[in-house]
């Protein structure tokens, strides 16, 4: 496992963003782990999080000049990543949306840069894909070109059908990048001799894996 992935998992554990136990998901499934990027709320952890996203984008050589952060979790992610990219000499622009259209002041649904050019959607995880589809529509309506999606964790899990939402996105010709995926997490736990957790995650993946 490379240093970036292991360092990200350690940060997620330290901030209790990543937890192990029994968690009931919206789908009704009982998951042995849970990931909540909303718990990256300290300035230093947000700074590091932005660096992880930025490094992943650069390592994957993604061709883009614009980040779109879906409300609400995507907003700090886009901001932190844009700052991290600027520190690495890559100046990109940021846009995010409002949940409700504003009818006064500057009005509209979008805040930040005009949503044009080669754009990457940034989020923490993608499950049902609702936020992705809304973002995809906004980008298209405003003249942008969707070049990819980056998330923190790919659960490698199918949805209510045999396919995962990420598989359906990829079938549209849209690349999906992640800082880590479930198999990285399993490898990390094996290296840390946490075999009980490994067994639970492998059983879950065998049952629900995409």
Curated annotation (Swiss-Prot):
Binding site for 5-phospho-alpha-D-ribose 1-diphosphate: 26, 72-73, 98-99, 102, 104, 123-131
Cofactor list: Mg(2+)
Keyword Lipoprotein attributed: no
Reaction(s) the record says it catalyses: orotidine 5'-phosphate + diphosphate = orotate + 5-phospho-alpha-D-ribose 1-diphosphate
Enzymatic class: transferase
One term under GO cellular component: cytoplasm
InterPro entries (UniProt xref): OPRT, Or_phspho_trans_dom, PRibTrfase_dom, PRTase-like
Pathway: Pyrimidine metabolism; UMP biosynthesis via de novo pathway; UMP from orotate: step 1/2
A single GO molecular function term of this UniProt record: orotate phosphoribosyltransferase activity
Keywords: Glycosyltransferase, Magnesium, Pyrimidine biosynthesis, Transferase
GO biological process annotation, one example: 'de novo' UMP biosynthetic process
EC number: 2.4.2.10
Chain positions recorded as orotate binding sites: 34-35, 127, 155
Subunit structure: Homodimer.
Similarity field: Belongs to the purine/pyrimidine phosphoribosyltransferase family. PyrE subfamily.
HAMAP family noted in UniProt: PyrE
Function, as annotated: Catalyzes the transfer of a ribosyl phosphate group from 5-phosphoribose 1-diphosphate to orotate, leading to the formation of orotidine monophosphate (OMP).
Record-given protein name: Orotate phosphoribosyltransferase
UniProt source species: Legionella pneumophila subsp. pneumophila (strain Philadelphia 1 / ATCC 33152 / DSM 7513)
């Amino acid at each position: 496992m490379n240093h970036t992935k292991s360092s990200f998992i350690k940060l997620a554990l330290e901030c209790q963003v990543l937890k192990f136990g029994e968690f009931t998901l919206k789908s009704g499934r009982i998951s042995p782990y849970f990931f909540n990027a909303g718990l990256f709320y300290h300035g230093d952890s947000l700074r590091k999080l932005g660096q992880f996203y930025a490094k992943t984008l650069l390592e994957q050589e993604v061709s883009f000049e614009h980040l779109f952060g879906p409300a609400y979790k995507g907003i700090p992610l886009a901001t932190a990543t844009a700052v991290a990219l600027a520190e690495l000499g890559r100046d990109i622009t940021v846009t995010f949306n409002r949940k409700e259209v504003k009818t006064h002041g500057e009005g509209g649904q979008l805040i930040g840069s005009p949503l044009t050019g080669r754009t990457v959607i940034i989020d923490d995880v993608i499950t049902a894909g609702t936020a992705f589809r809304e973002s995809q529509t906004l980008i298209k309506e405003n003249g942008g070109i969707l070049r990819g999606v980056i998330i923190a964790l790919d659960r490698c899990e199918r949805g209510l059908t045999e396919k995962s939402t990420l598989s359906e996105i990829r079938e549209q010709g849209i690349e999906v990048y992640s800082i880590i995926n479930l198999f990285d997490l399993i490898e990390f736990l094996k290296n840390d001799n946490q075999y009980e957790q490994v067994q639970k995650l492998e059983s879950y993946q065998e049952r629900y894996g995409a």
